[in-house]
Amino acid sequence: MAVAVGRPSNEELRNLSLSGHVGFDSLPDQLVNKSTSQGFCFNILCVGETGIGKSTLMDTLFNTKFESDPATHNEPGVRLKARSYELQESNVRLKLTIVDTVGFGDQINKDDSYKPIVEYIDAQFEAYLQEELKIKRSLFNYHDTRIHACLYFIAPTGHSLKSLDLVTMKKLDSKVNIIPIIAKADTIAKNELHKFKSKIMSELVSNGVQIYQFPTDEETVAEINATMSVHLPFAVVGSTEEVKIGNKMAKARQYPWGVVQVENENHCDFVKLREMLIRVNMEDLREQTHTRHYELYRRCKLEEMGFKDTDPDSKPFSLQETYEAKRNEFLGELQKKEEEMRQMFVMRVKEKEAELKEAEKELHEKFDLLKRTHQEEKKKVEDKKKELEEEVSNFQKKKAAAQLLQSQAQQSGAQQTKKDKDKKNPWLCTE
């Protein structure tokens, strides 16, 4: 029988019986129909070394062939490549995004290999937060790119986790749902595989790495999740090749020594991974991403912006009060900055004026020095000119005197010559 719940002013709840059918028992159907028409999105981050089988496992999980480019081991750094696909099963549409970590683990110095991954996850959170903070939000049409599940591919060494794996998972565990898996599990003997799993889980616990916990609080999935949790990390094998086994064709990897069936639970944990990731807990992964990881990021960002739920006295703070407080704080800082800039401008102007005055003084001094030098040089030139003029005048006088003496000498010589002639020819005179 349907039951109505009211909330009186005294906050006590009373159960009321309905006298007839109302219709809100169809709410689950309405929600299912609405969700089905909208479709779903699911974003998977694959973290692992180059060539460890990330693309093959994705193809096997979703029973299709996704686009993938062959990667080399020569990447200078880690970069993330995201590809989105539209899938449909029955009448349910799924927008699937697969993000690959290209070049992860290929560098000699692996200290910062996790940073591009963390930055990518934060960038998706930031994009969603910016959409939420818009005045006109459109979350209905927004393509949510937040990472819902991180499949962390562990190399099948059979010994222990690499330091790179521990550091990366520790940096990611507060930002994403980590599901550790052992890749290419068919390369490890079965007895060694159990020891390897135990060693991995022990190292994760001792290093404080928080991996995704399958929910056990819902009766419908509690039993299967509790059973599957003991198999972590899942040891998987991926293959899209069909091999004939008896009278049937099955996905498997064929070796000279035998066949490893992908969907045979005695051979690997692929079926367990698919059940846990897709069939049972896909919605919980989406919910955990929003309510846990995104909320943590959102809270930290809003606190950085100065938004808090309580004031220093632990009293509730309204959004309006927070806004006014931040606005006043911002205006105060703005006025302070303006005053600092004004003072700095005045100081710079004074410094410039002093520099200009000093430069002007130096120019005047240089001008006076040049003027004095010019006058001195002019005086020297004039004195030299006067000396030269006197020398020319004296030279002219001497020249005139010399010419006069020469002329007189010539005249005297001519007269003497005539006298001498007269003495030699006296008869000329008598005649």
Swiss-Prot record:
GO cellular component, one term: septin complex
Entry-annotated residues carrying Phosphoserine: 9
Name of the gene this protein is made from: Septin11
Main localization category: cytoplasm
Residue ranges, annotated region (G4 motif): 183-186
Residues where GTP binds: 48-55, 103, 184-192, 238, 253
Region (Disordered): 400-431
Tissue specificity field: Highly expressed in cerebellum, olfactory bulb, hippocampus, cerebral cortex, thalamus, and corpus striatum. In the hippocampus, strong expression around the pyramidal cells of the stratum pyramidale and in the stratum lucidum of the CA2-CA3 regions. In the olfactory bulb, particularly strong expression in the external plexiform layer. In the cerebellum, concentrates in the molecular layer, particularly in Purkinje cells, where it is found at the base of dendritic spines/protrusions, at the dendritic branching points and in some GABAergic synapses.
G3 motif: region residues: 100-103
Region span, G1 motif: 48-55
Range of residues in the leader sequence: none
Source species, domain of life: Eukaryota
Annotated family: Belongs to the TRAFAC class TrmE-Era-EngA-EngB-Septin-like GTPase superfamily. Septin GTPase family.
Protein's cellular compartments: Cytoplasm, Cytoskeleton; Synapse; Cell projection, Dendritic spine; Cell projection, Axon
Listed Low complexity bias regions: 401-416
Protein name as it appears in the record: Septin-11
